[in-house]
Amino acid sequence: MTQPPITKESQALLSSLAAQRDHVLGILEGLSEEDLRRPILPSRWTCAGLVHHLAIDVERFWFRAVVAGEPMPDEEPDNAWQVPADVTAAAVLDAYRRETELADAIIAATALDSPPAWWPEDLFGSWRLADLREILLHVIAETACHAGHLDAARELIDGRQWVVLTE
């Protein structure tokens, strides 16, 4: 099987996705298990829970299931925002890294204009992303949004900021 060519467009999309993934992991560096599992905002999500959601509902779902057509395991939690008590935050971060590596392999083997191998019509109805290009844009936007959520949580935990604004 030949790999699709790397174009300026695909390189730009992959660079943007990599930057957002690095942001997610980078803003959490140095936090303790307790901090990663502690709800910070009134909605009660945790940093570990958000990364678990990104691993399962974003990376695994969009790339392995939708793009590659791999079935989602039956044991996947209905609420990926909740990390089981017996799973450490470090294990959640490792799972996210693994899912991004698996996703990258799928992306590298798929042309940008390839349609999804599977589409969950029961979830989305008539709404549909047409190809890998649109799926990448969707995942970049969702990951960036959640990276911003993690920025706010981190600043509330210990004052650290990913981007420091000056006057």
Question: Over which residues does each language-model region extend?
Answer:
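Acidic/histidine-rich alpha-helical segments that form the ligand environment
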Residues: 80-120, 131-144
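Active-site rim elements
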Residues: 8-13, 89-93
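Short, contiguous alpha-helical
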Residues: 2-3, 10, 14-29, 33-80, ...
